[in-house]
Amino acid sequence: MDRKKTLINSSVSNNNSTIKGLQLFIADLRSAQQAQEQEKRIQSEIVKIKQHFDAAKKKQGNHDRLGGYQRKKYVAKLAYIYITSNTTKLNEILFGLEQTVELLKSSIFSEKFIGYMTLELLYERSEVVAKVNDEVNYQLMKDLSSSDDNFVMLALNFVGVVGELTNRLAYNDDITTGVFKILRSPTSSIYLKKKSALSFLALLKSNHSILTEDLQRKQLWIQRILSLLDDTENYRLTLATIPLIEFIAKYIDPSYCTRLLPQLTEILYNCVVVGTSRSSDNQFPLEYTFANMPNPWLITKVVSLLSILIASPTERDSGSLLQTNNIDNELLNKLRKCVSVAIELGTRQAQDPMERIVQNTVLFSLINFASKLDPSDEAISNSVTALCSLLTSKEINIRYLTLDSLVKLCSSSGKPAIDAVRYKNLDMIFHLLNTERDSSIVRKVVDLLYTFTDVENVKIIVDGLLQYILSPKNLAEPQIKSDIAVKIAILTEKYATDINWFVIISLQLLSLTSNTTINDDEIWQRLCQIVVNNPSLHRITCERLVDYLCKKQASEAIIKAAAFLLGEYSSLITDRISSANLFTLFAEKYFSAPNVAKAMILTTMIKLYKTSPEIGSNVIKFFQLELNSLDIELQTRSFEYLNIIQLAKVNGNTDILQILFEPMPPFNSKSNPLLKRLGSLPASAGSTTLINTPSEASSSTPDLLSKRANSSRSIMVPMPPPSRRNTIDDVNSKISSSEDFSGKDSYYSRQILAPNWREGFTRMISHKQGVLFTSSLMKVFYRITTPDAQQPYVFHISLAFINLTEWEITGLSTQIIPSKTQGNPEYLIMNINTPSTATIGPHKRAEQSYEVSIRKPFDVEDSPILAIHFKCGGSTNTINLKTAIGMTTTLISSDVNPSMHLNLAQFISRWKTLSDALGKEGEYQKSGIKLNKDFRKVETISLEDGLLLLTQTVKRLGFDIVDQTSVRSTLFVSGIIHTKSEGNFGCLMKIQYQVNGTVNVTCKTTTAGPLAKYIVECIKNVLTK
């Protein structure tokens, strides 16, 4: 293995001698008994060093009066003073910066090392950077271009450490270019490439524009960086390069990194499957093995990168470019094999604690990644079983990570994972909840229970969580129990099927005293909203609230909820308790309640007076008593209520009371405030919920309880207003999987295209940009580009929607509909971006883009359909356009790749070869193609001019024209069709121009099948109307 001398040894050696003065100085500081003694020693040393440095400035000629050894010693002392003073003595040591820079200029490794090390410590301070930045950059460039690898290594190490501390290095183009040259240079050692990769990552984190400003640089540099992974067995370089590639994929452009899937899969497979195999064929290098696991650091980094590049089947509108249906089956099977082997390793008994930790680390990373691979139900169940077996581990970290992985697995894999947890391991999870003493584990257990709760198990889980809150044996941390109470409230609201149970649980939560949970205003306020909106709950809730008020002690939340609801609906329970008795109950609770609850009780009393004037004397006396309250709010409220009662008596009616205290209208809250308490916790398992977040809500969405409740009346949860969806629906989920007789999706076949769609369709075949559609309302422009010349079968399509009217276009949304989504489709729609805005002002524009990957040949008539939906001038409009993506779109002109150009002899030879090999199987002929209006005038001009127009059209498609004069009326054409899955296909054509203005085309391809027909159809679309 490539070994370098360690920096520690190098830093303390100079011709095999140690810096004794530095060692003595450090020993003196450590032996100081008092801070004053240590400070005195530091100050004396600073004065001494300053004197030596001042004397060095007065050197005569080229004679260095200080010497490298002394300079190194004194700078190292200043660095130690900076460290031991906790960076507080920066201003006292700044005088040494000049001599520190002098060390950088030294040709001795240890001196240069001390210089760089000291500046790495100080460069986080702006005053240091301001003083020496230019000199440091100059010396840094010299060392980066040095022929001594040790000096290059020191410079790279400095860039890697300092690159994220200051933006100045990252914005210095010379330094970034110097680091990149080392990274791409074929003569750089592996050691230097590793350091340069990490240094370049530090620069890139500080300045993304290194790779984003210049497109040519971006393409060239990223491709060079990705090429570092071509050697999949060079694990040392791979380990250092993957973090850089991951950053590029995450923050710069993931489209460049998708081509790495085969290499990454191979690396992961070699480490996890081949490397752990007990077969004699396993030749995995022992130097990369740790705790009987081949390169665990590399495994976790590769999985992290793959997680960015691959989107799981359940992820919608993902920015990832790779879906499981895009990945070759061989690669997908290898990735799945890695997951299954990791599960086997995770369940294997290991005596060594370190080996067990490594096994579990690999297990967690791969199981969290498994949901991206569209796993089978059995694979998901095995993953859950493996994880649950770790819940009994004695190590807190293992239990925590296990629960975290289970939460992610349940939220991403859905029903198979949830069923495996709740049907097989629910008792184990509740046992862990009741016996665990670590608060972080308890939180994760509760999160897991919340994640897989649905209508079937809501009562079991809610009862178990309530028992935990009420049990004195469990953790007494109030915040944990408060969070559990919030989750209980949400679950009962979402999945209650019995209104009695809903009310019982909700009030039981509110009845918990401050000794067991924090009194959350959100819980009782949310309950009041639901009760107000549901008449079926008015009476039953009020009756149970009275029961709680009759108890000697009532919680603050119960008092507040009772004051609010009984003030509104006391008339419904007069057969059980009179208004006078209710007034007495509230009066008893009043003096033990906090001021906020007291204010609510005062309002409740006047509401009771409104429904039962006979209690007026008691109410008036109570208000008069509170006029002397110490709280100004209670004084004011009592005074105002007394005036209202007096005014009502003077008028002889209660109209003013009826107006001021009208019945509470239904709430129309936009969101459940309790959901904010969940943070980033995934949604629970139920597919139908009582509560909908704003993004999920619809005015027509029925609530769950109303469907299942025995009562004819239903709970009506406060619903948000309907939200407009502007996102593009995921193609695979929105389009029906059923197919018609032609193999196309029925949803695709049912689309009715706009009357003028073919004009833009034809233009799109032959031109890379132009007008796709024009109407009185909207004009649509398109542009087709190939992001990567190495992948000519992947196209980036940009669309622009122009509003041609004097009114706003609103509700703009689009849908990209492929002809086929199931059964190995010919092309895939990827990386769909939503329109830049849903509202387009008059004569303004919106933009959108997506990508198409051609996997195998197909007819241009099966191109994707762009469905545009919008409103304008009060009308709702839908425009369906077919976007032309044909086989000719994959052509690369010989101007780009000169090696593709054929002469006449080569053309004739290859034509004969194809005829002998395939006969008529790879051939297609089309005669009598009538030219469109742009060619009709050809009849009146010369043959040469007509052929010239044909030549321009064919070359615009991307074909190469063979230079020849033997057959004047015929064009000899060649090209290469590119596909992702089935490879590349050669194409030869003879295009004969007739005197009557028609064209005959004969096409041969290097494969049997309809490809030749597909190519001719593209040409026919361009030449005809």
Swiss-Prot record:
GO MF, any single term: clathrin adaptor activity
Keyword annotations from UniProtKB, A to Z: Cell membrane, Coated pit, Endocytosis, Membrane, Phosphoprotein, Protein transport, Transport
GO biological process, one term: clathrin-dependent endocytosis
Modified residues (Phosphoserine): S733
Entry-annotated residues carrying Phosphothreonine: T727
Gene3D superfamilies assigned to the protein according to its UniProt record, in alphabetical order: 2.60.40.1230, Leucine-rich Repeat Variant (1.25.10.10), TATA-Binding Protein (3.30.310.10)
Ranges where the record places region Disordered: 713-737
Keyword Signal: no
Note: Present with 1590 molecules/cell in log phase SD medium.
Subunit note: Adaptor protein complex 2 (AP-2) is a heterotetramer composed of two large adaptins (alpha-type subunit APL3 and beta-type subunit APL1), a medium chain (mu-type subunit APM4) and a small adaptin (sigma-type subunit APS2).
Record function comment: Adaptins are components of the adaptor complexes which link clathrin to receptors in coated vesicles. Clathrin-associated protein complexes are believed to interact with the cytoplasmic tails of membrane proteins, leading to their selection and concentration. Alpha adaptin is a subunit of the plasma membrane adaptor. Facilitates interaction between APL1 and APS2.
Protein name: AP-2 complex subunit alpha
Natural source organism: Saccharomyces cerevisiae (strain ATCC 204508 / S288c) (Baker's yeast)
Lineage, highest ranks first: Eukaryota, Fungi, Dikarya, Ascomycota, Saccharomycotina
Protein's gene: APL3
